[in-house]
């Protein structure tokens, strides 16, 4: 199976406005640093590797190159600032739904930002408010072999490969995630919970 996050692999699968424009980089310190303030809502950057990826509360996000879905999405929600923390849960639920749809697994949400399979973390979400925008970072352990899961958290982390026994197409997962996230985001903007 060819597993790529290249524009050629991702863009034909996009159905909505999220992921447009789409930028891919092979390696970066963190995708959270790559979206400029002037980027439009829906702009997305994805990478095969993050050398300084981080999660909520400054925790490190570690993943071998080419095995995970690592991306950041620009949002410009016109809502009260008090509602912005809700975006973390909106994105985590969309991630959970995409994983379930593509794998048949039954992931659960560990409030506010982690997606678990069993008792082990498979994905995380980080929402950072910056001026008039929110940069939403999402990391999913997709094709990480069991022996390459980070040693310091090997009892707490898993991957979709470990849980399903098969490699998954990261571009398909990204497209499924963006479709669900756009739908949930629009409902959230309109006041639905």
Model-derived regions: residue spans:
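Residues at or immediately flanking beta-strands
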Residues: 21, 106-108
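N-terminal lobe of the biotin/lipoate ligase/transferase fold
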Residues: 1-101, 186
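Short beta-strand-initiation
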Residues: 32, 56, 110, 120-122
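Long, positively charged amphipathic alpha-helical accessory segments at protein N-termini or as interdomain linkers
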Residues: 2, 81-106, 117-193
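Short loop/edge segments at beta-strand edges and connector loops
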Residues: 26, 109-111
